[in-house]
């Protein structure tokens, strides 16, 4: 598998290293993760931008995760530091946004690419904002039907949009991967 990954054509599959919020707000750790991802062949590195004040209500309110998320927040200064560091080491860097406010912060630093996570894949104000303000939009589809995805993406030019097939159960059993859905997406979307 190692050889297949590193000998692939550059215009084909892209490997995205998901840093997420695993840095827990520690910039030194985040930079190390970016460096290691690049060293190990990632084409892009992705983190998450969110403000716990903007998070919708959910299970994280009752199980203590909201407090953990708070520690992992990246403000504009920290995000810019990571973006500039990534640029310095020639590693493409981008983030997921949970709200329009988060997307605005990302746009101030980098309007080239943004990701919308599965749980926000039906957040029309966020999607419409991104369609107007970003050159490339990646949308995860783990919690949406095809009909919902088509409706959400109707205002995004096809050349800007990449759809990710996602399964929102962790760890995912192979029987739950639903890989044929990728072929279905290819019928409707240019980049899957």
Regions found by a protein language model. Give the residues of each.
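Catalytic cores and adjacent flexible loops of soluble metabolic enzymes
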Residues: 1-192
